């Protein structure tokens, strides 16, 4: 993600405070100059940058600050707070109501990725258990219905449109009525793309809006136009009641920071951001976690939400086995399935403190996914005895012929099968040691159930299993321990005050 360049530069500026022997006005000004330069390079409006600098300066009075206070943390906190303010419109975003029929109308410029974003939003809510559907009321662009139909079919989302009807108002009205009668909860209407000077298309947009009475009008914005987003968003807000904004193409443009801050300046809440072309390259936008991830400080709350989506608590049989230190090849297979359900690896890594959003490139991500699928293919060729044995690796070592059979069945080499078994053995050994830690699987606040010495042992085991580069990115053992503490607090629902500056 190109936005990661901005995150890297700001993080580098903040870290310069740690290298300074004395924190004085000169050090503060040098750091602020670096931060402001990075923001200007990301096309953030100069007035907003100037305001950020003034706000930090007024919040930090080095001469008046008590000697016992940690000046570095105070400055870092002030910068973090101002960065959050930069992308926060100060308006609560609209959210759909479960059990109700929520009609969402999409508007935006041509080429902003509106039709693709409609499908992404429908897929996002579908994965969360909502009954979603799509309506194509874009009769202006040739191929619009074909594109929506293709996206919807691929994601198995019901859709409505017409090749013969040319009146978007009729299509939208008929589609909404049809899906309301079928009790759909999220009804998404895609409209024709337009430019702000096209009065006829704006009139059409108003007619569609008046006909279907949407609960939420979403404006889709292309991040590549940077701070010009502000004028575009205002033009749309003047015509229709735009309640939310989705910013697309944040993965490929250096002006993303300018786009986000410009939208916030219009007092329109950003609800999602598009970070790639795939249907799951789509993330809910929350200001504080976004800035936290941008600066490599992670988003533990988001990570816990992802884990909770998998409903792992329902798997009582697995929890019971883990309590006794048992872990089979089938368990590993199921965990691989869960990892794939959580979405793109880069999104997950970005939520872990110490990792920037750029840690894993698209190429590496595809390679990792392919490797995971390959391991699952190998396990698909194993029989029940091999998958369900509490010591799966021993079953294969006693009868090496099994390795050859599995390799032939999955179309891989015997070495690939052996590598899988080695990986499984490491997992199984760790689970065995975790099973000896009383209170680890009780649920609730782990820090109350598990002693400090036991937690330290668990952290050491995790560190041994990790790739050294990964551990380094997390800030070594201290970073790993900090993440585990945050995860414990998050699991207990205590997310307040988690700023994560201790590893800066």
Swiss-Prot record:
Q: What class of enzyme is it?
A: hydrolase
**A cellular component term (GO) from this record?**
cytosol
Q: Where is this region: M-domain?
A: 296-504
Q: Which SMART domains match?
A: AAA (SM00382), SRP54 (SM00962), SRP54_N (SM00963)
Q: Which InterPro entries does the record match to this protein? A: AAA+_ATPase (IPR003593), P-loop_NTPase (IPR027417), Signal_recog_part_SRP54_M_sf (IPR036891), Signal_recog_particl_SRP54_hlx (IPR013822), Signal_recog_particle_SRP54_M (IPR004125), SRP54 (IPR022941), SRP54_euk (IPR006325), SRP54_GTPase_dom (IPR000897)
Q: Give one Pfam family, short name only.
A: SRP54_N
For the region NG-domain, give the residue spans. Answer: 1-295
Alphabetized UniProt keyword annotations: Cytoplasm, Endoplasmic reticulum, GTP-binding, Hydrolase, Nucleotide-binding, Nucleus, Ribonucleoprotein, RNA-binding, Signal recognition particle
Q: CDD domains from the entry?
A: SRP54_G
Q: Which SUPFAM superfamilies match?
A: P-loop containing nucleoside triphosphate hydrolases, Signal peptide-binding domain
The record's comment on protein family reads: Belongs to the GTP-binding SRP family. SRP54 subfamily.
PANTHER family according to UniProt: SIGNAL RECOGNITION PARTICLE 54K PROTEIN SRP54 (PTHR11564), SIGNAL RECOGNITION PARTICLE SUBUNIT SRP54 (PTHR11564:SF5)
Query: What's the domain remark here?
Result: The NG domain, also named G domain, is a special guanosine triphosphatase (GTPase) domain, which binds GTP and forms a guanosine 5'-triphosphate (GTP)-dependent complex with a homologous NG domain in the SRP receptor subunit SRPRA. The two NG domains undergo cooperative rearrangements upon their assembly, which culminate in the reciprocal activation of the GTPase activity of one another. SRP receptor compaction upon binding with cargo-loaded SRP and GTPase rearrangement drive SRP-mediated cotranslational protein translocation into the ER.
Task: Quote the subunit structure annotation.
Answer: Component of a signal recognition particle (SRP) complex that consists of a 7SL RNA molecule of 300 nucleotides and six protein subunits: SRP72, SRP68, SRP54, SRP19, SRP14 and SRP9. Interacts with RNPS1. Interacts with the SRP receptor subunit SRPRA.
Q: What does this protein do?
A: Component of the signal recognition particle (SRP) complex, a ribonucleoprotein complex that mediates the cotranslational targeting of secretory and membrane proteins to the endoplasmic reticulum (ER). As part of the SRP complex, associates with the SRP receptor (SR) component SRPRA to target secretory proteins to the endoplasmic reticulum membrane. Binds to the signal sequence of presecretory proteins when they emerge from the ribosomes. Displays basal GTPase activity, and stimulates reciprocal GTPase activation of the SR subunit SRPRA.
Q: What is this protein called?
A: Signal recognition particle subunit SRP54
Chain's gene name: Srp54
């Amino acid at each position: 993600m190109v936005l990661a360049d901005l995150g890297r530069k700001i993080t580098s500026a903040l870290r310069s405070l740690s290298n300074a022997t004395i924190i004085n006005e000169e050090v503060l000004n040098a750091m602020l100059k670096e931060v402001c330069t990075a923001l200007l390079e990301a096309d953030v409006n100069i007035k907003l940058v100037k305001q950020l600098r003034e706000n930090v300066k007024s919040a930090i009075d080095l001469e008046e600050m008590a000697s016992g206070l940690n000046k570095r943390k105070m400055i870092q906190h002030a910068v973090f707070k101002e960065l959050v303010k930069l992308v926060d419109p100060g308006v609560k975003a609209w959210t759909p109501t479960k059990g109700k029929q929520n009609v969402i109308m999409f508007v935006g410029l041509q080429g902003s990725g509106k039709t693709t974003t409609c499908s992404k939003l429908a897929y996002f809510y579908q994965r969360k258990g909502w009954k979603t559907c799509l309506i194509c009321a874009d009769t202006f662009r040739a191929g619009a219905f074909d594109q929506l139909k293709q996206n919807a079919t691929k994601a198995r989302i019901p859709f409505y449109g017409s090749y013969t009807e040319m009146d978007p108002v009729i299509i939208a009205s008929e589609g909404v009525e049809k899906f309301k009668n079928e009790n759909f909860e999220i009804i998404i209407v895609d409209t024709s793309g337009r430019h702000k000077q096209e009065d006829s298309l704006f009139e059409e947009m108003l007619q569609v809006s008046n006909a279907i009475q949407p609960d939420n009008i979403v404006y889709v914005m292309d991040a590549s136009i940077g701070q010009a987003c502000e004028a575009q968003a205002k033009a749309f807000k003047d015509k229709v009641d735009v309640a939310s904004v989705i910013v697309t193409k944040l993965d490929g443009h250096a002006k993303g920071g300018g786009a986000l801050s410009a939208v916030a300046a219009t007092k329109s809440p950003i609800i999602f951001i598009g970070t790639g072309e795939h249907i799951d390259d789509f993330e809910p936008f929350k200001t504080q976690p976004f800035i936290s991830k941008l600066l490599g400080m992670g988003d533990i709350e988001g990570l816990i939400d992802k884990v909770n989506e998998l409903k792992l608590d329902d798997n009582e049989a697995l929890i019971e086995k883990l309590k006794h230190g048992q872990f089979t090849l089938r368990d590993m297979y199921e965990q691989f399935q869960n990892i794939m359900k959580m979405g793109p690896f880069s999104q997950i890594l970005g939520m872990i403190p110490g990792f920037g959003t750029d840690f894993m490139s698209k190429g590496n991500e595809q390679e990792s996914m392919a490797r995971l699928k390959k391991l699952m293919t190998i396990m698909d060729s194993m029989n029940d005895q091999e998958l369900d044995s509490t010591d799966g690796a021993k079953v294969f070592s006693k009868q090496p012929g099994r390795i050859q059979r599995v390799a032939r069945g999955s179309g891989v080499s015997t070495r690939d099968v052996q590598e899988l078994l080695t990986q499984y053995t490491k997992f199984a050994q760790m689970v065995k040691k975790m099973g000896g830690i009383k209170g680890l699987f009780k649920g609730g606040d782990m820090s109350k159930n598990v002693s400090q010495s036991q937690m330290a042992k668990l952290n050491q085991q995790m560190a041994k299993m990790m790739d050294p580069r990964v551990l380094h990115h997390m800030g070594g053992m201290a970073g790993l321990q900090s993440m585990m503490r945050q995860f414990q607090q998050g699991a207990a629902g205590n997310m307040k005050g988690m700023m994560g500056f201790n590893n800066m």
